[in-house]
């Protein structure tokens, strides 16, 4: 009977996820995942994007109260914007809450000039993430007051859902709320190669948050949500042999499964190997010395450096390695990691 675990163990396992931050902000990151099986870049990228934009917990203003105002179709003398415009601007306030319970924060200001989110008296439990965001503009000597109710939630909710059973007091206006801390997610899929195989997927994602959480945390939370939801579909029990880590004897030295980027090589030598798509020591020892010297920018000094390192593992150039590369090389590399470290 075919082992069930071969359905997932035979797939390529990505080695790592890399995060690249942008120097101008900590709220935006480039995430690179490679290598992936062909088609998995699109599958994972689309699923992660949907979860990131819809399912993470965040905080937002859900209602406002302005003295003397009973509904959103009003205007205030001395205020440039009408209530509808003020509500639209309030929806753009980005906040972070340090408690799970709702909080009421207050804004008191006197004109003239622009009134910004940074003027709100937020207290210790609420943090304003975009203090320069303009709420309204006041005429000279005009006083303006407003109470804002903040809550924790997920996704996007309409004002009708934020009016708790139509129990809001008169004068308190429910507004639409965007709780999600993720502002934007884009992704693209490119080809990447391992050895001579060039059609593996590389997933590149760009994630930007409002500062409530870091992009790395947002990606981790989205993955955890997907993991929890997909667990429901696993309707079988793994066979006993699937649960055990197999350690059958290899037809070659486990040192061949060590990645060359883990060797203490000079930058020049490491770059030459990388540019020639030599990933594992097994890829390296199958080359002859003559093959290596034909590699661009690879000279005798680099050759001698690598020969000394290979000798420490009782290896050399020009070796005949049976069954190399194995189909499940990434799985084997992780399984035998303790053998060569």
Curated annotation (Swiss-Prot):
Name of this protein: DNA-directed RNA polymerase subunit alpha
Q: Which residues form a coiled coil?
A: none
- Top-level EC class, please? transferase
What's noted about domains in the record?
A: The N-terminal domain is essential for RNAP assembly and basal transcription, whereas the C-terminal domain is involved in interaction with transcriptional regulators and with upstream promoter elements.
According to the UniProt entry, its GO molecular function terms are: DNA binding; DNA-directed RNA polymerase activity; protein dimerization activity
Q: Which family does it belong to?
A: Belongs to the RNA polymerase alpha chain family.
Q: One GO CC term of this entry?
A: cytoplasm
């Amino acid at each position: 009977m075919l082992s069930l675990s071969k359905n997932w163990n035979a797939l390529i396992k990505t080695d790592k996820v890399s995060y690249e931050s942008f120097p101008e902000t900590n709220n935006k990151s480039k995430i690179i995942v490679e290598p992936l099986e062909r088609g998995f870049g699109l599958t994972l990228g689309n699923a992660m994007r949907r979860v990131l934009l819809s399912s993470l917990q965040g905080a937002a203003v859900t209602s406002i109260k302005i003295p003397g105002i009973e509904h959103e179709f009003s205007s205030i003398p001395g205020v440039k914007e009408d209530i509808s415009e003020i509500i639209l601007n309030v929806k753009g306030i980005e906040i972070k809450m340090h408690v799970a319970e709702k909080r009421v924060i207050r804004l008191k200001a006197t004109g003239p000039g622009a009134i910004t989110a940074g003027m709100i008296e937020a207290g210790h439990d609420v943090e304003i993430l975009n203090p320069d965001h303009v709420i309204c503009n006041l005429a000279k000597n005009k006083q303006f007051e407003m109470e804002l109710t903040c809550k924790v939630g997920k996704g996007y909710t309409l004002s009708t859902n934020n009016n708790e059973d139509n129990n809001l007091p008169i004068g308190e206006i429910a507004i639409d709320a965007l709780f999600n801390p993720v502002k934007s997610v884009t992704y693209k899929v490119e080809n990447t190669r391992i050895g001579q195989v060039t059609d593996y997927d590389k997933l590149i994602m760009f994630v930007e948050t409002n500062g409530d959480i870091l992009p790395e945390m947002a990606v981790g939370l989205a993955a955890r949500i997907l993991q929890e939801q997909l667990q429901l579909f696993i309707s079988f029990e793994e066979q006993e042999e699937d649960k055990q880590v197999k350690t059958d004897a290899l037809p070659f030295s486990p040192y061949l499964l060590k990645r060359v980027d883990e060797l203490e090589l000079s930058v020049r030598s490491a770059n030459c190997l990388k540019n020639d798509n030599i990933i594992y020591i097994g890829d390296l020892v199958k080359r002859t010395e003559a093959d290596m010297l034909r590699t661009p920018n690879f000279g005798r000094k680099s050759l001698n450096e690598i020969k000394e390192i290979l000798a420490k593992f009782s290896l050399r150039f020009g070796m005949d390695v049976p069954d190399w590369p194995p189909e499940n090389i990434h799985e084997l590399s992780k399984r035998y990691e303790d053998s060569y470290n």
